[in-house]
């Protein structure tokens, strides 16, 4: 029975370019949609730009245009980039739409009627110059824990501490530079802590859908269990769903000057995009996919592809909103990890913060990236590392050396010797290939989004096809008298196997598959076309080169095109009463500020005595485990062995949170030796207790990007003291 599925991807924010990190999730979603359609399932695939919020309003103001003009322009840019990478949405909408306003107001009204909305007075920082309340990320100042300057209002990027904006020292508005003042405002809250919501979410996050599949991957379900707690516990906080004017968004009905927070109407944008698409087509019953009762009776599915950074919103707030407003809840959340490049966080200084547009402008084939991302995807929340040398090797070996090579070695003989017409296929070869396919379970791997396993099995089949060609040597048969019939069979069989490989690769490489369909003069391939030998007498077209090899110089040019200079300005200290820069977050400006600070402090730092130095207990530490910290942009959780043991004599590693995520992939750290401060007082952080500090080097003047953890010389052992 055909499945009926509504698939969405997370809505990109209309305040910046699409980059390769974004594309991980969109490519994963597009592959799954293409596979489902090839299997004969009915799939509607929609997305939209997320267009509301303070950053949109301020960026438009800076550019001297209206927010509407900004989001219209970015909408075109985003859709262009997705199209260039083969992400084939049926419709790409905007959250700033009539459909989204109607849905947001309706859902809010139903939640209000069900007792899930309440108002409270809260105290917030207010910018007296811009006459606006400031979101946490638009307040900056000195960290209350370590004293680092130029830190955001919710967490410190230097020491990793989390705090309230009111705890910042010397706070200032990142919008105007003015000193903010505290003001009280009435806000609207969605009561996520309501026992009805807690009970529902505890069941929903741990349960299965109608098809018997878990709604959440195991890692996501475990995270929900941590956030929800056990039965009888209530760890959830209510959710502030309102913002004060001025704000770019939808005004809350009956609340002048109050607007829906962007995260309320953003996921509702899935429904709005689908409604616009359905009404434009005229043959889709929207309620069959959105209404709780009708969705159940019609057996429709709602599948969201999202990044793990927005799991909290999609696995808690979103299903609870839908449930208690009478809408269907998601069938499944497909959560992907972050992208690293060559084992490190994307970096503008290294040129690895690569935009989708620059990749296309530099002339690189987008299907190289689609293939590589698919090869690294396994259906879990693990991060994907784009190892550029590995991508070159994998594309050149798998796609050019194995797959395309089959057609390039055989097509010419069909054209020259047999007037472009195929002969009979070798029944034994095709039967052996079919048997190998059935054991590979490629379709199951695609359905489970384990694309890496699917591609490994497809390349194993490509090896079998190449082995068939190598064993029968058509280039030698062509030179031998009386072997034309055998040559015809061998080349025709090879092209039938090539057709099947193309079919299996089509969800990942739709553009290349279209070229092959044209070359073999075939209609669009469907999954059940496999094992139907191309008939004798079938005419194919002239072979055209299908894919070029990746050259290292192309990758180097791409990195150079994306490299942002971090050269600092002249080393002059800012005036004591100078206002901070208006725009926050620039790497260039951050480097300049760090350089200014260094210029002042290098000669002014007081000397310390040897006694002061010996108070610091520096130890050699072995990194026995390293993990990403969910919800932290900068931190890695380390387990460090410094020779300590528990009462039973077993190793007792220390837990330390280190702000080195921008420079290191956790997997590359395990087993390394480094240096830590062992007698630093334990500090309770948002993510757990930190029992020390790892030492790392960085360039104080900002000329060289990066962080570098210290490593001892050969022979040092865990627990040794550094003197």
UniProtKB/Swiss-Prot annotation:
Could you tell me one molecular function GO term of this UniProt entry? tRNA binding
Which residues are noted in the entry as ATP-binding?
Answer: 348
Q: How is the cofactor bound?
A: Binds 1 zinc ion per subunit.
Q: Where is this motif: 'KMSKS' region?
A: 345-349
Protein name per Swiss-Prot or TrEMBL: Methionine--tRNA ligase
Name the major location: cytoplasm
The answer on whether this UniProt entry bears the keyword Metal-binding reads: yes
Q: Which residues bind Zn(2+)?
A: 143, 146, 156, 159
Does the UniProt entry include the keyword S-adenosyl-L-methionine? no
GO CC terms = cytosol
Write out the similarity annotation: Belongs to the class-I aminoacyl-tRNA synthetase family. MetG type 1 subfamily.
Which keywords has UniProt assigned to this entry? Aminoacyl-tRNA synthetase, ATP-binding, Cytoplasm, Ligase, Metal-binding, Nucleotide-binding, Protein biosynthesis, RNA-binding, tRNA-binding, Zinc
Please state what class of enzyme this protein is.
ligase
Signal sequence, start to end: none
């Amino acid at each position: 029975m055909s499945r009926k599925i509504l698939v969405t991807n997370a809505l990109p924010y209309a305040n910046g370019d699409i980059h390769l990190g974004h594309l991980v999730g969109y490519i994963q979603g597009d592959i799954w949609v293409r596979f489902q359609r090839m299997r004969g399932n009915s799939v509607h695939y929609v997305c939209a730009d997320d267009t509301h919020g303070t950053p949109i309003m301020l960026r438009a103001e800076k550019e001297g245009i209206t927010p509407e003009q900004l989001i219209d322009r970015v909408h075109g840019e985003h859709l262009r980039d997705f199209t260039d990478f083969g992400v084939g949405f049926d419709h790409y909408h905007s959250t700033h739409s009539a459909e989204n306003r109607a849905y947001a107001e309706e859902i809010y009204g139903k939640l209000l009627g069900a007792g899930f909305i309440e108002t409270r007075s809260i105290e917030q920082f207010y910018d007296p110059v811009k006459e606006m309340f400031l979101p946490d990320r638009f307040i900056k100042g000195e960290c209350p824990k370590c004293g680092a300057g130029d830190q955001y209002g919710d967490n410190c990027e230097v020491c990793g501490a989390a705090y309230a904006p009111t705890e910042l020292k010397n706070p200032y508005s990142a919008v105007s530079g003015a000193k903010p003042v505290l003001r009280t405002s009435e806000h609207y809250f969605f009561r996520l802590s309501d026992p009805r919501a807690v009970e529902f979410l505890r069941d929903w996050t741990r349960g299965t859908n109608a098809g018997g599949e878990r709604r959440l991957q195991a890692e996501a379900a475990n995270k929900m269990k941590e956030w929800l707690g056990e039965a009888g516990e209530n760890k959830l906080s209510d959710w502030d769903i309102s913002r004060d004017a001025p704000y770019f968004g939808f005004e809350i009905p009956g609340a002048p000057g109050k607007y829906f927070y962007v995260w309320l109407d953003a996921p509702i944008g899935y429904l709005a995009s689908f409604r616009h698409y359905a009404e434009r087509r005229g043959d889709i019953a929207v309620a069959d996919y959105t209404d709780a009762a009708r969705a159940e009776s019609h057996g429709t599915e709602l599948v969201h592809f999202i990044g793990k950074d927005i799991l909290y919103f999609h696995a808690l707030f979103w299903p609870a909103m839908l449930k208690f407003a009478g809408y269907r809840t998601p069938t499944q959340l497909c959560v992907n990890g972050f992208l690293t490049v060559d084992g490190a966080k994307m970096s503008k200084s290294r040129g690895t913060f690569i935009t989708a547009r620059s990749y296309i402008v530099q002339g690189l084939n987008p299907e190289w990236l689609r293939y590589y991302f698919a090869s690294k995807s396994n259906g879990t929340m693990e991060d994907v590392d784009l190892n550029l040398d590995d991508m070159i090797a994998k594309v050149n070996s798998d796609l050019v050396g194995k797959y395309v090579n089959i057609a390039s070695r055989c097509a010419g003989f069909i054209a020259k010797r047999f007037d472009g017409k195929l002969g009979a296929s070798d029944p034994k070869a095709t039967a052996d290939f079919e048997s190998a396919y059935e054991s590979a379970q490629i379709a199951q791997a695609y359905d489970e989004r384990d694309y890496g396993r699917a591609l490994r099995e497809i390349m194993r089949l490509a090896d079998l096809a190449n082995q068939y060609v190598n064993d029968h040597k058509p280039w030698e048969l062509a030179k031998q008298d009386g072997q034309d019939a055998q040559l015809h069979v061998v080349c025709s069989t090879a092209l039938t196997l090539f057709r099947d490989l193309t079919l299996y690769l089509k969800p990942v490489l739709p553009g290349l598959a279209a070229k092959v369909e044209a070359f073999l003069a075939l209609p669009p391939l469907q999954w059940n076309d496999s094992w139907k030998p191309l008939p004798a007498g079938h005419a194919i077209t002239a072979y055209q080169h299908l894919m070029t090899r990746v050259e290292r110089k192309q990758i180097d040019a791409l990195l150079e095109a994306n490299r942002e200079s971090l050269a600092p300005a002249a080393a002059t200290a800012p005036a004591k009463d100078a206002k901070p820069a208006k725009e926050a977050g620039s790497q260039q400006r951050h480097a300049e500020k760090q350089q200014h600070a260094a210029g002042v402090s290098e000669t002014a730092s007081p000397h310390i005595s040897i006694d002061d130095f010996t108070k610091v207990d520096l130890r050699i530490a072995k990194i026995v485990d390293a993990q990403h910290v969910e919800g932290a942009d900068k931190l890695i959780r380390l387990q460090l062995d410094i020779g300590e043991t528990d009462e039973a004599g077993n190793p007792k590693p220390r837990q330390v949170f280190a702000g080195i995520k921008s420079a290191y992939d956790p997997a590359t750290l395990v087993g390394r030796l480094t240096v830590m401060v062992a007698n630093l007082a334990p500090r309770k952080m948002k993510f757990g207790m930190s029992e020390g500090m790892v030492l790392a080097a960085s360039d104080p003047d900002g000329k060289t990007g990066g962080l570098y953890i210290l490593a001892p010389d050969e022979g040092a052992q865990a627990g040794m003291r550094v003197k």
